[in-house]
Amino acid sequence: MRKIMIVDDNYLSAEGIEKNIDWEVLNAEIVHICYNGTSAIDAMKKEPVDLIISDIEMPDLDGISMSRQALDINPMVKIILISAYDKFEYARRALLLGALDYIEKPLDYAYLIQKVKNAFALMERCLLY
């Protein structure tokens, strides 16, 4: 079963991702829900995850910086960054640092599910080689 971490300083956004996706059907489970980047890094050190779904704009440690640290801890972790801001610069920075994908809010859960499936498929391909 794949392990997922959700990181968003907006409780309703994090809860929406948790509740609007049938994780069991995807053979995945939410193991961490964090509300800032620092707690996400701490949680990841305690229990590694396969996929991080994170907001970009957060106090303390933003999603870009958190992603950079997460990839330092586990270079194989896949990251999908989300943002309410449609700034190309965010997407560019996210992809340059190694994030798998960038999605704008408001979230289309069907689209997010497809991106999660793509991440899982990539993980499977990496295991084959």
Q: Which residue stretches match the model-derived regions?
A:
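A generic structural motif
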Residues: V25-V31
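Conserved acidic segment of CheY-like receiver
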Residues: R2-S13, I17-E18, I52
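Conserved Asp/Asn-Gly motif in the active-site loop of CheY-like receiver
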Residues: V31-T38
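CheY-like receiver
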Residues: I41-Y129
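Residues at the starts of beta-strands that form the adenosine-phosphate
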Residues: K3, I30, K78
